[in-house]
Amino acid sequence: PNLRNGVIEHMTLVPGGNKCYCGQYGCMDTYCSPETLLEDGESLSGFFSVLRQGEHDHRKRFDHWLANVAQAVSNIRALLAGDIIIGGEAARYLDSDDMDRLKSLIDEKSAFHDTRFTLRKSLCVEDQNIIGAALRFVQSYVTDVCNTEV
């Protein structure tokens, strides 16, 4: 009815925190975006490559980022107590140990400890936005040919 969708990435995670591109301060995006892991000139794949080699500074940045993501998920679950899918580019680089650790951090930060929810990564492939955008143009054709809904 209001012709808008939610923008959860602009919920305040840290009151008075980092300035966001939206003009507010402390938005989740300024703490949970994978770009917050990177230093000048560093790529996300490069960051995770160095992290997996055990470099201390990268581990420290990753631990801080993971704690922020856990707090954000805990806040979201306080309102919407459902399963969680971690998506976006960073999900491509998270391994099973990272996901187990994230679930543990979420539980630690939750008011009512409940590990019965499912936490998983989305299927993240290169150019997924392009593929997703194209789907609406071929959906009826695929449905007709495959005799199934896409």
Regions found by a protein language model. Name each.
Residues P1-Y31:
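Glycine-rich phosphate-binding loop of actin/hexokinase-like ATP-binding domains
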Residues K19, M28-V150:
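ATP-binding/phosphotransfer module of carbohydrate and carboxylate kinases, centering on a glycine-rich
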